[in-house]
Amino acid sequence: MPEVPKVIDVRDRQFVQMELDAAFHAHKSLFRKAFWINKGISADACELKIHQLLMAQTVGLLIPRTLISNKPKEIRAFIESTGEHIYKPLTGYLWQEQGSVTQTFTAKVTAELLPENSLLAATPGIFQTKVPKKYEARIQFFGRFYGGVRIESHTLSGGDLDWRIGQGGIKACAPAVLPRRNLPQMSQPHGAARHCQWRI
């Protein structure tokens, strides 16, 4: 997404950001006659984690017990229930820190790690029961054809939470094969079927 140049006065930043966003999204409409593997609206929807969870259920995949909320009382009750839990932001985010780029990852969360209520209420988050993984699969669908890789996340540093944390340790990946029972539903055009990250 385009960012507002630092030269812009603080009073004008919101307006400039709106203009940049409008131009960015309108730009896609200039290529209506082009062949898209993923049309803009589908690619955008694919980045929405709530949409991904709904799509997973639609095609018959099981998802962990999930709470999406910014209500501190609900969040604390969920985290204090039986089992281990994780937190995911609704979107990915990159930022500069001490001269290097870092990003958001899935994180383990406990009642002790939760911030004060005012911070919990500031923005919604995705809270889920932690599911032990044998491996993770990254799948790309192109119509009825799919290609995927099996990531042995349990061998990676931090891989029990998010394979990307230790992705530098990946030497090779085997092909991922999906169960035949899920293929008819997963190969249908769902509007945002660019890729499906499936935890197994």
Task: Describe each model-derived feature in a short phrase.
Residues 1-62:
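Conserved N-proximal alpha/beta basic substrate-recognition cap immediately N-terminal to
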Residues 121-124, 129-130, 141, 158-200:
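A long amphipathic alpha-helix within ATP-dependent nucleotide-binding catalytic cores
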Residues 71:
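Short, conserved beta-strand/beta-arch hydrophobic-aromatic motifs that form part
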Residues 86-89, 128, 136-153:
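Beta-strand scaffold of nucleotide-dependent catalytic cores
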Residues 53-57, 64, 75, 79-97, ...:
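ATP-grasp fold ATP-binding core
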Residues 2, 42-43, 92-93, 132-133, ...:
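Short, solvent-exposed loop/turn segments at secondary-structure junctions
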